[in-house]
Swiss-Prot record:
<dbReference type="InterPro" id="IPR003593">
    <property type="entry name" value="AAA+_ATPase"/>
</dbReference>
<dbReference type="Pfam" id="PF00005">
    <property type="entry name" value="ABC_tran"/>
</dbReference>
<keyword id="KW-0067">ATP-binding</keyword>
<dbReference type="GO" id="GO:0005739">
    <property type="term" value="C:mitochondrion"/>
</dbReference>
<dbReference type="InterPro" id="IPR050334">
    <property type="entry name" value="Molybdenum_import_ModC"/>
</dbReference>
<dbReference type="InterPro" id="IPR027417">
    <property type="entry name" value="P-loop_NTPase"/>
</dbReference>
<feature type="binding site">
    <location>
        <begin position="339"/>
        <end position="346"/>
    </location>
    <ligand>
        <name>ATP</name>
    </ligand>
</feature>
<dbReference type="GO" id="GO:0016887">
    <property type="term" value="F:ATP hydrolysis activity"/>
</dbReference>
<comment type="similarity">
    <text>Belongs to the ABC transporter superfamily.</text>
</comment>
<dbReference type="InterPro" id="IPR003439">
    <property type="entry name" value="ABC_transporter-like_ATP-bd"/>
</dbReference>
<dbReference type="GO" id="GO:0005524">
    <property type="term" value="F:ATP binding"/>
</dbReference>
<feature type="domain" description="ABC transporter 2">
    <location>
        <begin position="307"/>
        <end position="537"/>
    </location>
</feature>
<protein>
    <recommendedName>
        <fullName>Uncharacterized ABC transporter ATP-binding protein YDR061W</fullName>
    </recommendedName>
</protein>
<feature type="domain" description="ABC transporter 1">
    <location>
        <begin position="8"/>
        <end position="265"/>
    </location>
</feature>
<keyword id="KW-0677">Repeat</keyword>
<keyword id="KW-0496">Mitochondrion</keyword>
<keyword id="KW-0547">Nucleotide-binding</keyword>
Length: 539
């Protein structure tokens, strides 16, 4: 790679999504010059990072045709560039939420090793696999990847059993094992705990020095609020509407970066003040119909615990995940559920929503009543729960993203039975329920294009916002927010956090980044099976 003069070069280019004459350009102005050289480590920074990574991935049509060039291709080559783009949106796709926890029953599951190889598919019920390509696997590189990404002990684990952080590392290994010419990674640290962030960051910092890989240039995408790793050498600040604002060596642009970040925060505060001054729908207007609204402390303490775990233990094939867990949740309380990736947080939440095969356990007590097979109804339990999570996001996008608009997407939150129901319901709602949807859309700034924009056409941030509003709409007793704000822009996230401070129901939050964590009064920290901490937050 070092013999090439450049990796990627853009010269006086205009990018479009199609050849149609009326197709609008991705950015209104031409990109005069942008270049990545060997040994440079770039971060694409700001709200336009996703589009720009797509530009580098050759996903758009460039005018003139040779205005986007790749230095690792020969001038006369007809071979397309080998570019791997890794976007972390949810976990391994599954047909329904409970499949995430029924992985040991899935006839078409793969081990972590098979997933990283990405060569075959087949059933666990038979002894053979169907080869999907004839690509030769570089086993030296594979061994180096699993060692450096801490995947050695996970090679034989089923993919559906991996935590979000483990799955993130496996996806990274899968892409790099294809030995691409260029690796693009959007939000590499999103939703990860500090230990997982350190593992991936250290790996990316030294990747080009792993001898068996041969190395390839890596470009990452980060938001304004993200910490830029010290190993990044260059930055390209991209606005979603105007394209490149500035680019070059980080050491020469630090003051400009500080100014841009500061200006973005000031604009955010101004938007917030303007919004508050003009607001004709208050938070009280939105929450006054919640069953817990207006409840006094002396009334709440007389109620049974909404959730009680009385020495709960859960294991997979003899391996403990949760052990002897005692936890009580009072109605209306707000909890931050903490723990490293793989500590059992997702398992705990799946038990509460009855998506886990071991949910029917008398040591799980709902409103003072122990769960028992045949006595406790899955649909009754979920009628009281609202949820937003990476798993739900991935499944909603796949199953409903191309057919439901914003208003219809939010309205599906009214389905009593489960958060996993995406069937259209808007036209069947009564006028009162429709008005509630409309009020929520207006308050959260989603009303303008609510009928004309499909869910899949939204940015990741707006998709997250729609799913958050969807989780509120049926006034659930329990609101589960599993990484609900990872990937959300600062302004809507702050609005959501402000709203949650007034929300009268019980809230269970999983978040690894302090800025993405709404205010909570208590915390449960899972450390290892049988070891945990419960305490009060210091807000």
């Amino acid at each position: 790679m070092s013999t090439n003069k450049f990796v990627v070069r853009i010269t006086n280019a205009l990018f479009k999504s199609s050849l149609a004459s009326n197709s609008p350009p991705v950015y209104p102005k031409r990109i005069r010059h942008f270049e990545i050289l060997p040994n440079e480590k770039w971060v694409i920074w700001g709200p336009g990072k996703g589009k720009f990574l797509d530009v580098l991935n050759n996903k758009y049509i460039c005018e003139p045709p040779l205005s986007l060039r790749f230095g690792f291709l020969k001038e006369s080559s007809n071979i397309l560039p080998r570019i791997e783009q890794v976007a972390f949106k949810g976990v391994m796709p599954t047909a329904h939420l409970s499949a995430r926890y029924e992985y040991f029953k899935d006839d078409y599951d793969q081990t972590c090793k098979q997933f990283i190889f990405d060569k075959a598919s087949g059933s666990n019920a038979v002894s053979y696999k169907v080869e999907t390509n004839n690509r030769q696997i570089n086993m030296e590189l594979y061994n180096a990847l699993v060692e450096n990404l801490n995947l050695s002990s996970l090679q034989d684990r089923w993919v559906m059993g991996l935590s979000n952080g483990q799955m993130r590392r496996a996806r990274l290994a899968r892409s790099i094992l294809k030995e691409p010419d260029l690796l693009l990674i959007d939000d590499p640290f999103l939703g990860l705990d500090p230990a997982a962030i350190a593992t991936i960051s250290q790996f990316l910092a030294k990747y080009d020095s792993i001898e068996v890989s041969g190395g390839c240039p890596i470009v990452i995408g980060l938001r304004y609020q993200d910490t830029i790793p010290a190993w990044c050498t260059h930055i390209c600040c991209v606005d979603e509407k105007n394209g490149i604002l500035f680019e070059g060596p980080i050491e020469k642009l630090q003051s400009k970066m500080d100014e841009t970040r500061s200006r973005a925060l000031k604009e955010l505060e101004q938007l917030k003040k303007a919004s508050n001054s003009k607001e004709d729908i208050s938070i009280n207007d939105l929450i006054c119909i919640h069953p817990m609204y207006g409840k006094k402390e002396h009334e709440i303490i007389k109620m049974p615990h909404l959730i009680e775990l009385d020495g709960l233990s859960v294991s997979y094939k003899g391996e403990a995940v949760l052990e002897n867990l005692h936890w009580k949740v009072q109605p209306g309380s707000k909890w931050h559920i903490r723990g490293d990736n793989g500590s059992g947080k997702s398992t705990l939440l799946s038990l509460l929503t009855a998506e886990h095969p071991q949910s029917w356990n008398s040591r799980v007590i709902d409103n003072g009543v122990p769960r028992r097979t045949g006595k406790t109804n899955y649909f009754d339990l979920n009628s009281k729960i609202g949820m937003s999570s990476p798993e739900l996001h991935a499944i909603f996008l796949k199953n409903a993203g191309g057919r439901l608009n914003i208003r219809e997407s939010v309205a599906t939150g009214y389905h009593e039975a489960s958060s996993n129901n995406y069937l259209p319901i808007w036209k069947r709602l009564d006028k009162n329920s429709q008005e509630i949807v409309n009020m929520y859309l207006k308050y959260f700034g989603l009303d303008k294009d609510a009928d004309s924009v499909l869910f899949e056409q939204l940015s990741v941030s707006d998709q997250k916002l729609v799913l958050f509003v969807r989780s509120l709409i049926k006034m659930p007793q329990i609101l589960i927010l599993d990484e609900a704000f990872s990937g959300m822009e600062v302004e809507p996230m702050m609005r959501c956090h402000e709203f949650l401070e007034e929300w009268p129901g019980t809230v269970l939050v999983v978040a690894h980044v302090a800025e993405e964590t709404p205010k909570c009064a208590h915390y449960l920290r899972l450390i290892s099976p049988g070891e945990y901490e419960i305490g009060d937050m210091e807000n």
